[in-house]
Amino acid sequence: MITRKLDIMDCYMYRDDIFECYQTNKLIFDSQNPIKINTPDIAAEFIRDFVEAEDSCVMGLFDDSKKFLYGLVIFDNIRYANNKSCAQVHVVNSKTIFGEVVREIYDNIIIACGIDTIYAEIPAIAVFPINICKRLGFVKTGYIPEALPYINSKGQEKMYDIIILTYKRRKRGET
């Protein structure tokens, strides 16, 4: 598996793969969000905005031949001050690469990015992503009660909490 920073051409070249990642991770957008990624072209445009943004970095997870893109790690709202850095992270991947291998890749990306504090905001209904973050070393640092509407397995739209998870990079020599 190869990881590298995405460029604008990648957004279009891998638009079908990006679209599949968002189809696999339907809870990324709440039920009333105006963003609807329902075509590969919309998926490409959505990611292109992050690639072009000055305060974002998009990393792609590719197969060894770079024929397929299996996932994205988006560092957004990157900020630096007084030798410290912070960013919000968004992660999506295709259903073809769930498991221990992808967790190890995400772990390596988070360690290598060099950002001191990384945070994720995940709806409480999205149990799988919350558990992945916890396995990567993220800690629950807060929540926003009844913040986003989602349709549950019974077809009911309800307001769910947003869980805030934070990862603090350890300095060399710390355990």
Q: Can you annotate each of these PLM segments?
A:
Residues M1-D16, K171-T175:
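Conserved N-terminal entry element of GNAT/NAT acetyltransferase domains
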Residues Q23-R48:
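Conserved GNAT-fold acetyl-CoA-binding loop/helix
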Residues N38, A44-K84, V92-K95:
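Acetyl-CoA-dependent GNAT
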Residues Q88-F98, P123:
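A short, internal acetyl-CoA/4′-phosphopantetheine-binding micro-motif in the GNAT/acyltransferase core
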Residues T96-I111, N131, R135:
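Conserved acetyl-CoA-binding loop-helix of GNAT-fold acetyltransferases
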Residues A112-P123:
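Conserved GNAT acetyl-CoA-binding A-motif
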